[in-house]
Amino acid sequence: MADSKEGVLPLTAASTAPISFGFTRTSARRRLADSGDGAGPSPEEKDFLKTVEGRELQSVKPQEAPKELVIPLIQNGHRRQPPARPPGPSTDTGALADGVVSQAVKELIAESKKSLEERENAGVDPTLAIPMIQKGCTPSGEGADSEPRAETVPEEANYEAVPVEAYGLAMLRGMGWKPGEGIGRTFNQVVKPRVNSLRPKGLGLGANLTEAQALTPTGPSRMPRPDEEQEKDKEDQPQGLVPGGAVVVLSGPHRGLYGKVEGLDPDNVRAMVRLAVGSRVVTVSEYYLRPVSQQEFDKNTLDLRQQNGTASSRKTLWNQELYIQQDNSERKRKHLPDRQDGPAAKSEKAAPRSQHWLHRDLRVRFVDNMYKGGQYYNTKMIIEDVLSPDTCVCRTDEGRVLEGLREDMLETLVPKAEGDRVMVVLGPQTGRVGHLLSRDRARSRALVQLPRENQVVELHYDAICQYMGPSDTDDD
């Protein structure tokens, strides 16, 4: 009992010493970017500007010259194999059987290894990188199971390193091509490639590109002048193809007429022009327009108006003179005796008169630029009916019928294609229909074959005209 009591400590004898806690390990502060570590991003290198030459900036550090990209050609690895010996009668069938069995065993072992690897790598991404072996190369080693050579396995290509436009030249350089040298074994000469240029917008396949380029103004542009001179010469300089700008038509049915641009059609490269004579809006290709100054526009439009006024006044005077002549002739006929009617009629028949050439089914050109404000100027049309020797009715290609057209408003039209039918309108063969054989633009003459007379005649352009009538018509 005494021993047990001695081993038990009393509760009241507790120690009054203070209790303290401490840590023996401290956590180090982690830095996100370590400047001493080589794996971190390198600081940006500063460059300084050295000189400025034109639009080029030269720095202190010279730039490396761009290297020419070369894609080496993959050589074919065809190797010569010794010819197989023909099987002789001494061939051991047992050796052949052993070879077949050993090959089957190797295939089974390879298949088992493959399945084992697939099971082990079940959790791995199934997308594998399959190396491409050079075409025509056989794996090195004794058997077919040996690994391919390292040089036959291509490296992973960096497609961003080679631009698309430089890929073809890089392949040619790898094949041994050099700039300035010909390609070929027998006729190695440099052949310039044919580059097809795009046609100007708005010109189709039937348009003549050379004529459009010839009409386009190619003069040198003027240097800008001071503000005072620009304001002074503002009317002397063309504004260009802009709405409100003055232009002149260079080609087409409205050739030589002036007008102002009302609007532009950039999709079809055409402009809506209001003609100065007649105030009619027409659509013309921009290639057939030339901008003019306001001073030139005012001068030419004034001349056209004066010509129009003089033409109308001449027409009025001509009508008055014709009326006076008719009145005088009627008065003379009343006062002359009846016995003079016979000789007078004979003298009228013997008097020379101008020969008229109007005939039905002739294709003519309208040349009067004052008729209805020049609306039908340089337009091709067909004579529908002849009202009098010098008056006719015509129909345009659009189907419009024009009545009361005089002979002096029209001119004969010679076809361009050889073999087209023409009619002789002046001379002893008037009214004959033949075929055009050839034309001579320098002399304005043409060779015409007349089938009925079976002869070939040379006539002037004014003596023939394109005929659009029935093929079996050949009036005498």
Curated annotation (Swiss-Prot):
Keywords: Acetylation, Isopeptide bond, mRNA processing, mRNA splicing, Nucleus, Phosphoprotein, Repeat, RNA-binding, Ubl conjugation. Belongs to the MOS2 family. Residues 164-210 form the G-patch domain. CDD domains: KOW_GPKOW_A, KOW_GPKOW_B. This is G-patch domain and KOW motifs-containing protein. Residues 13-26, 210-219 have a biased composition (Polar residues). The modification N-acetylalanine is found at residue 2. The modification Phosphothreonine is found at residues 216, 316, 473. One of its GO terms (molecular function) is RNA binding. Residues 43-58, 224-237, 337-351 have a biased composition (Basic and acidic residues). Component of the minor spliceosome, which splices U12-type introns. Interacts with PRKX. Interacts with DHX16. Interacts with PRKACB. Residues 240-267, 415-442 form the KOW domain. PANTHER family: G PATCH AND KOW-CONTAINING, G-PATCH DOMAIN AND KOW MOTIFS-CONTAINING PROTEIN. One of its GO terms (cellular component) is nucleus.
